[in-house]
Regions:
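Short intrinsically disordered terminal tails
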Residues: 1, 119-130
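Negatively charged, low-complexity tracts enriched in Asp/Glu with abundant Ser/Thr
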Residues: 1-35
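Ampiphathic alpha-helical segments that act as solvent-exposed interaction surfaces
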Residues: 3-16, 75-120
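Intrinsically disordered, low-complexity regulatory segments enriched in Ser/Thr/Pro
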Residues: 33-101
């Protein structure tokens, strides 16, 4: 999968100018991921690899220890917690309801864009064979 083509499809679903996307490649395993920012805050990283379809990760400015949860969690520059992920699929609110809703709606939009992208790939493969 090429991030540039996927990003182009995503733009149809990301109509709010507050959102920006940036392509990055994970050095650790070579998988391609797209980072999504909301007003400059990194809020979501989505992995394009088939075997990691549910790899949604919260990106934070920094991390700090939460006494309430007994673990290190992502937070903003002012120290307020953004949220925590459980099994990469459920986001638990720690205090930023509107941001949580935005992130969850982003995930749905990305899923729609990914289905469209896969459809285009299949159509292209079919044309190449014919």
């Amino acid at each position: 999968m090429t991030p540039k083509k996927f990003k182009k499809i995503c733009k149809k679903y990301f109509t709010d100018p507050a959102f920006t996307m940036e392509d990055i490649s994970s050095v650790a395993d070579g998988s391609i991921t797209i980072s999504i920012f909301y007003y400059g805050y990194g809020v979501l990283r989505y992995c394009l690899d088939e075997d990691r379809e549910k790899s949604f990760l919260l990106i934070a400015d920094k991390f700090r220890y939460s006494e309430k949860y007994g673990k290190i969690l992502p937070c903003r520059n002012d120290g307020s917690f953004i949220g925590i992920w459980n099994d990469y699929t459920k986001l638990y609110n720690v205090g930023h309801n509107s941001l949580i809703k935005i992130i969850l709606s982003l995930i749905e939009k990305i899923k729609i864009a990914k289905v469209e992208y896969k459809k285009q790939l299949l159509e292209k493969d079919f044309e190449n064979e014919g």
